[in-house]
């Protein structure tokens, strides 16, 4: 039996409300951008299949609500995640300060060896930037995780962010995980899909 992909990776986008998680997802999955901002209610997800080192990788990317009242809903989505992208807004110091809290959430709910990536979004707003690139890079280095500044609006580094994450997960899983490794995840990941629409009203 030959599946249409070699790997299935579940990724999460987390971070404060308004940092641009949904815009990053839209840019990567659909190559679109919208100025109209609507808060994600609970959880949304999109799928995109990529090629990496001759392998087909299906990325299932979950966009979680940043608001406090949805924390209990979204905590269950940490389970089974292979990679988590922590997003802050380079023009919002508070969203950067809260990265530490989001990392604590990962430690609390996600599997121990989950891959992490720190992303500073809205890099196109250069005149409003308050979080220094060097500061964020040093912080990410101290944690041993990759760091990128992105702009969903200009599509800067968006592709690179998701590709970096996919490459890191693939490297961690090793060649042995390719053919059979994703099948148990299919069972785990197929159940929340039904809840995504109705469970958050």
Swiss-Prot record:
The modification Cysteine methyl ester is found at residue 201. GO terms for molecular function: G protein activity; GTP binding; GTPase activity. Prenylated; by GGTase II, only after interaction of the substrate with Rab escort protein 1 (REP1). It comes from the Eukaryota. It catalyses: GTP + H2O = GDP + phosphate + H(+). The keyword Cytoplasm applies. It holds the Pfam family Ras. Regulated by guanine nucleotide exchange factors (GEFs) which promote the exchange of bound GDP for free GTP. Regulated by GTPase activating proteins (GAPs) including TBC1D20 which increases the GTP hydrolysis activity. Inhibited by GDP dissociation inhibitors (GDIs). Mg(2+) binds at residues 22, 40, 63. Keywords: Acetylation, Autophagy, Cytoplasm, GTP-binding, Hydrolase, Lipoprotein, Magnesium, Membrane, Metal-binding, Methylation, Nucleotide-binding, Phosphoprotein, Prenylation, Protein transport, Transport. Its cofactor is Mg(2+). It is a lipid-anchor. InterPro entries: P-loop_NTPase, Rab, Small_GTP-bd, Small_GTPase. A motif (Switch 2) lies at residues 65-80. GO terms for biological process: autophagosome assembly; Golgi organization; intracellular protein transport. Belongs to the small GTPase superfamily. Rab family. Rab-1B binds GTP and GDP and possesses intrinsic GTPase activity. Switch 1, switch 2 and the interswitch regions are characteristic of Rab GTPases and mediate the interactions with Rab downstream effectors. The switch regions undergo conformational changes upon nucleotide binding which drives interaction with specific sets of effector proteins, with most effectors only binding to GTP-bound Rab. The small GTPases Rab are key regulators of intracellular membrane trafficking, from the formation of transport vesicles to their fusion with membranes. Rabs cycle between an inactive GDP-bound form and an active GTP-bound form that is able to recruit to membranes different set of downstream effectors directly responsible for vesicle formation, movement, tethering and fusion. Plays a role in the initial events of the autophagic vacuole development which take place at specialized regions of the endoplasmic reticulum. Interacts with MICAL1 and MICAL2. Interacts (in GTP-bound form) with MICALCL, MICAL1 and MILCAL3. Interacts with GDI1; the interaction requires the GDP-bound state. Interacts with CHM/REP1; the interaction requires the GDP-bound form and is necessary for prenylation by GGTase II. Interacts with RabGAP TBC1D20. Interacts (in GDP-bound form) with lipid phosphatase MTMR6 (via GRAM domain); the interaction regulates MTMR6 recruitment to the endoplasmic reticulum-Golgi intermediate compartment. Interacts (in GDP-bound form) with lipid phosphatase MTMR7. This is Ras-related protein Rab-1B. The gene is RAB1B.
